[in-house]
């Protein structure tokens, strides 16, 4: 197609349908601005028949369903002809690099076979899928946010990294990714300063890393970054839109610019603004401060301990005051000068599933009960209670309609991590059976939609597709 991944090809006079012979095949390039595409086989005597022609009107039903153009024209430059004996095989290579010989093609194919994982059950499919998101770039490992739309996103990287890397035994690669993010935190890049919670997810990921390398290695390698990140909130280093107030809570507000993970924008306006004190941001903030204090005390950083020791209690007190909703057992989703927002969203469950939480056990039980009554589905947690008038049970229609539904109903998987952690924190091993049942609901998805992987989100109404 020789096009951008977000565009579709249409028949045009500018496309070059010519092909040029090379050893073992041909090279072609539809447009001058693109690299050459090398088409080769490992079978000597295979002939390429040049027959440039347009094929019109390929239909992509899913694209049409999603409100996009779903018809494409594709140009072929020709086809290969050869004769095969019974049982004989042929390997075809399409690459941006020319293969030096048929043996090179065979070697690359054999190496690819050797590196394949055996996808024989649900867990092995998940392990294989996790491998695909970890890529190598100059300077180390990196996590791709999703295929095929995005590159690396620091928030999504930090949330996914324990499962993608640590649980696969890829500890060194995990630390390479964290090193890159640590550098971004120290330099204050724009992609960090536009996300109120991302530096705080860094601390949560380090807590998972600690279980694999120990507290001393975490403090030695990242202690300076941890302290600097906290100071950037306190001292205004995150910019005027994101900062710690005198009450110990983190404030994040910018006109029509969403600063939390609920970051969809339609026609220049945030779908879920959540300006002010956001519940998961402050839960993560409290966890980050307490964790850094824990390590500072353990490894003798008296200066940091003296400067920050009184903050957790101040933050807990302010959280209890600002997030209290009269007559409701759960905390607010966010609070600012004009409202204490009582929408039931999955953000509150983050406050229950962290190592350090501002909620006592009775409060966590009430939050979990609320989550189970309003948000829990077989596929994850809804992004909004069905009883809310803004709720959308189907993620369908135009891009704008889907963006709205995505944060106002659609089910997300990742908050399940904190729901499960909170249940284990209260029930211990008594939750094992129920946790296994939650996981089993995803087994059938491995064979549909994203083959071998799970979907990012699901419809909020049954059958949760």
Locations of regions flagged by a protein language model:
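Acidic, mature catalytic/reactive cores of soluble proteins
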Residues: 1-465
């Amino acid at each position: 197609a020789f096009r951008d991944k977000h565009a579709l090809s249409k028949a045009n006079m500018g496309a070059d349908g010519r092909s040029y012979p090379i050893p073992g095949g041909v090279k072609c390039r539809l447009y001058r601005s693109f690299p050459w595409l090398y088409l080769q086989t490992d079978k000597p005597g295979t002939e390429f028949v040049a027959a440039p022609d347009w094929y019109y009107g390929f239909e992509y039903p899913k694209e049409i369903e999603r409100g996009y153009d779903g018809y494409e024209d594709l140009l072929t430059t020709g086809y290969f002809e050869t004769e095969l004996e019974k049982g004989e095989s042929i390997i075809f290579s399409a690459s941006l690099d020319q293969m030096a010989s048929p043996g090179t093609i065979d070697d690359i194919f054999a190496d690819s076979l050797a590196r394949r994982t055996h996808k024989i059950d649900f867990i092995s499919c998940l392990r294989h899928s996790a491998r695909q998101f970890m890529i190598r770039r100059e300077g180390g490992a990196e996590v791709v946010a999703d295929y095929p739309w995005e590159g690396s996103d620091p928030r999504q990287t930090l949330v996914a990294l324990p499962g993608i890397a640590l649980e696969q035994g890829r500890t060194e690669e995990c630390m390479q990714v964290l090193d890159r993010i640590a550098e971004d935190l120290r330099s204050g890049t724009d992609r960090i300063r536009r996300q109120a919670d991302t530096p705080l997810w860094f601390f949560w990921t380090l807590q998972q890393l600690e279980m694999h390398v120990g507290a001393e290695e975490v403090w030695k390698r990242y202690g300076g970054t941890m302290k600097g990140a906290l100071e950037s909130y306190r001292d205004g280093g995150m910019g005027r839109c994101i900062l710690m107030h005198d009450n110990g809570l983190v404030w994040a507000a910018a006109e029509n610019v969403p600063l939390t993970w609920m970051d969809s924008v339609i026609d220049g306006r945030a779908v879920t603004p959540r300006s002010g004190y956001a519940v998961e941001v402050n839960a993560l903030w409290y966890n980050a401060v307490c964790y850094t204090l824990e390590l500072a005390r353990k490894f003798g950083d008296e200066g940091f301990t003296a400067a920050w020791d009184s903050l957790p209690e101040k933050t807990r007190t302010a959280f209890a005051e600002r997030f209290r909703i009269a007559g409701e057992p759960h905390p607010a989703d966010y609070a600012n000068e004009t409202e204490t927002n009582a929408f039931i969203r999955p953000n509150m469950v983050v406050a229950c599933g962290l190592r350090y939480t501002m909620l006592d056990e009775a409060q966590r039980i009430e939050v979990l009960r609320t989550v189970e009554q309003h948000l829990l589905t077989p596929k994850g947690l809804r992004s909004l209670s069905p009883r809310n008038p803004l709720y959308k049970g189907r993620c369908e229609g135009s891009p704008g309609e889907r963006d709205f539904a995505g944060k106002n109903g659609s089910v997300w998987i990742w908050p399940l991590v904190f729901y499960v952690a909170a249940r284990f924190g209260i029930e211990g091993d008594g939750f094992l059976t129920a946790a296994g049942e939650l996981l089993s609901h995803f087994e059938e998805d491995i064979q549909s939609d994203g083959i071998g992987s799970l979907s990012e989100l699901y419809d909020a109404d049954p059958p949760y597709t």
